[in-house]
């Protein structure tokens, strides 16, 4: 017994220093780079639509790159006005910076539109910067990834049965490996439209829509999902009629049959049809999605990550939708820089469904826009493990799409 006690004490004498070292190592604060924001710069590009690229620079030579879209025209003065919230700040305090900018504009339109679009570009740049500073991909900073590859659908605008090239174009999309596509069925210049100010479609317009959907559905194989977009350009009566008439085609979704701001009408259409209803590209922040989700007005939500408030805000919107068992299928029309940023969110949320791609008519620019080259392979994006967003702009290619008479990442005052 005495011998066992001596053995225990001797072993403890050797073990205690090691244990003490381990405890000390665990209690030592983690070391991270001490950074301060020194500048914010912008560039304006016309890709599919109008995009503002944002770079946030630091005193350690690291910069982050973000991208905002759609209501980006007019966002640059707002972004420069936000310098007062940014210069001298620690860029890793993303939530604090985001909230200061948002609450600082409560009386200046911070509920949506250009203000939130400008904030979005900044927020995405901060996430890219944080990932680079910490040596981690953005998805890892958002809790890790639940998938390695992101399913992509090709938005291909219009497909008229009388266009001799239409069927070949659709087949090309399928040959490229896409398992889903979307096209538009709203048409302001429809010959059957009697009054451009009246949002009630005539029988002729609805017949034309049904004919186009039938043509597309027959032109691709059954394994390719088909969605259609009405861009919120019709009234409640038309939206309901179209949704019901398209039921036999088993669409992936019908997008914005009516304007998104009337949630009750959207809900009425959803309840009247088997066709899945989708909206969200024109909503901003979590607050814009709350009523849509609470009233179960849609089957699928599609926030635009480059204008809804940013990566973390999109993650929060997806999490809200997940509570209601509603899938998350983001709208996305941006360059490969913003596109890959969106992919990090899609990789991190369980209820992701599919991500839009709208550059099929700009393939050369798309493939050359980032140094890494093409990021979509056979209808999927593999999320990179590189720090931050994981792709870098090829400025020589990107400059070919620069908006005339705008600056190119010019240093601030």
What kind of feature is each model-predicted range?
Residues 19-48, 54-56:
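C-terminal segment of N-terminal export signals and the immediately downstream linker at the start
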Residues 62-134:
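Metal- or metallocofactor-binding catalytic centers and their adjacent structured scaffolds
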Residues 76-77, 84, 89, 96, ...:
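Shared catalytic-loop signature of beta/alpha-barrel
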Residues 123-159:
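Glycine-rich, aromatic-flanked loop segments that form ligand/cofactor-binding clefts
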Residues 149-272:
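Metal-dependent enolase-superfamily TIM-barrel catalytic cores that perform enediolate-based chemistry
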Residues 389-413:
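Extended hydrophobic packing segments that form well-structured cores
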